[in-house]
């Protein structure tokens, strides 16, 4: 189950985002997800199907705030 506080890594970056990080944190989840990338970029309304199929769960924290301050997120 996808939930806030999880850190994911995209398996493959889309061609339009080759310069950005492929590590992100789930900050909220409802019908869609809101995610935060290492550079601070926030994407809203992300489909959970994409996360399930094209991303790998790295680590899980109780809150998204703990996740963005974690070693796994900062040092990856």
Regions found by a protein language model. Give the residues of each.
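Short coil-to-beta transition motif at edge beta-strands of beta-rich domains
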Residues: 1-14
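Basic/aromatic-rich interaction segments and small domains that mediate binding to polyanionic partners
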Residues: 13-49
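Intrinsically disordered, low-complexity, charged/polar segments
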Residues: 40-76
């Amino acid at each position: 189950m996808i939930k806030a506080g999880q850190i994911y890594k995209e398996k493959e970056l889309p061609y339009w985002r080759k310069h950005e990080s492929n590590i992100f944190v789930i900050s909220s989840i409802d019908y869609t997800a809101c995610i935060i990338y290492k550079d601070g970029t926030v994407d809203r309304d992300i489909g959970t199907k994409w996360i399930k199929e094209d991303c790998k769960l790295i680590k899980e924290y109780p809150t998204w705030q703990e996740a963005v301050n974690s070693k796994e997120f900062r040092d990856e």
